């Protein structure tokens, strides 16, 4: 293979990018409304509910662990 045949695909990679221009081009950043405009209340409720559940479970487990520690070490 000739060296020029090997360099041809590389020259496309090194060429500056051509940006499309014209009135038909739209920016992808303005296609939708910002996510904070209308919160998804189902996701918000699910997230807060899960957080509360995990904290309650963590505190309950911690209290059980403390009681088990005291029982094993004769502190109770």
From Swiss-Prot:
Q: Can you provide one Gene Ontology molecular function annotated for this UniProt record?
A: NADH dehydrogenase (ubiquinone) activity
Could you tell me the Gene Ontology terms of the biological process aspect for this record? aerobic respiration; mitochondrial electron transport, NADH to ubiquinone; proton motive force-driven mitochondrial ATP synthesis
Q: What does this protein do?
A: Accessory subunit of the mitochondrial membrane respiratory chain NADH dehydrogenase (Complex I), that is believed not to be involved in catalysis. Complex I functions in the transfer of electrons from NADH to the respiratory chain. The immediate electron acceptor for the enzyme is believed to be ubiquinone.
Asked if the keyword Magnesium belongs to this entry, the reply reads no
Q: Which gene encodes it?
A: NDUFC1
Question: In which domain of life is the source organism classified?
Answer: Eukaryota
Which residues are the signal sequence here?
Answer: none
The Swiss-Prot or TrEMBL record describes its family as follows: Belongs to the complex I NDUFC1 subunit family.
Q: Where are the transmembrane segments?
A: 41-59
Q: What is this protein called?
A: NADH dehydrogenase [ubiquinone] 1 subunit C1, mitochondrial
The transit peptide region is found at 1-27
Instruction: Provide the topology term for how it sits in the membrane.
Output: Single-pass membrane protein
Q: How does it assemble?
A: Complex I is composed of 45 different subunits.
Query: Which keywords label this protein?
Result: Electron transport, Membrane, Mitochondrion, Mitochondrion inner membrane, Respiratory chain, Transit peptide, Transmembrane, Transmembrane helix, Transport
């Amino acid at each position: 293979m000739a060296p020029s045949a090997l360099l041809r695909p590389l020259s496309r990679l090194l060429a500056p990018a051509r940006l499309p221009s014209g009135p038909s081009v739209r920016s992808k950043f303005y296609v939708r409304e910002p996510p904070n405009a209308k919160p998804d209340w189902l996701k918000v409720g699910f997230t807060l509910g899960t957080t509360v559940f995990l904290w309650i479970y963590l505190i309950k487990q911690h209290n059980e662990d403390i009681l088990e520690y005291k029982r094993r070490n004769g502190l109770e």
